[in-house]
Amino acid sequence: MEKLQFQGGDRAVDEYAEYRRIVGDDDGGKLFTPEEYEQYKKTVLPMRLQNRLYVSWRSPCGMDCKLVGPETACFCTHRYKQHKTDFKELPKERPVLLPCKVSKCPCKSFHYIPLNGSRPIRCRCKHFADEHSLAGTYHCTKCTKCSGFHSSFTCGCGQPAYAHDTIVETKEERLAQGKPVGHDVPYASMGGLTGFSSLAEGYMRLDASGTGAPGASFLESSQSGASHPFLKMYDMPCTVQGVSEPPGIDKQVSSMRLSEEDDMAYFERRYQERLRKEKEHKRQKNSKPPTTQRP
């Protein structure tokens, strides 16, 4: 069989990928001509560079647990890129509504809903999210007792899903909160993505949109059985005036796995050690004499 070779094939693939990132589904499935493509870029790119909207799923503590991107699914099961994201002028009303552009979809605004693995999360009525209506309070279509979608699914930040909100904000509003905005890009429906770290969940993201970089007080804190796993993993011997000190014998013995121990016995022993240390710390705290004030 004769092998076909095309000159500049890799370049054509890159150009098509760039075209699809910029145009998205605005061409209706039919590729723009070169003239239409240039006219489209002249019309749309200034809007995206000046009026970009950042979309995130935010916890009560202010952490962006999820930064919405083009492929992020809405409550209506359609992607973020299938919603209205380009505005000639930014709306003054708050919250900003991003209606779905899919024909006959009643979704009035993008509303992020997390997944439990690959499946939708359940409401307190025991039915899945996609079994609820898109109108009003998202009442259930399978039962009459549900007054609206309300899920106790726990996010990685420790807060339930119902305590989170889908936030749509401008670049200025985001900068005022000290959150990253990234570079101005011409691509469609970028939402809250500002870099590669935006793909991680908020509690794992060491920037201003997530947990943030740990401070010196955290990194230099003394370690015990209840220390953060990060400190245990990257534990370094402490230094005093440039002389390194070996770790304590008790810590070495505690962290050493005995040959006859299985995994459960090892972790149970460490857990009991931590409980004893907490009780001892509480006993010392309560045994301190109260401070008396002189009359």
Swiss-Prot record:
Compositional bias segments (type: Basic and acidic residues): 266-278
Signal peptide: none
Region (Disordered): 244-295
A Pfam family this chain is assigned to: FAM221
Annotated family: Belongs to the FAM221 family.
Protein's recorded name: Protein FAM221A
Species in which this protein is naturally found: Xenopus laevis (African clawed frog)
Gene it is expressed from: fam221a
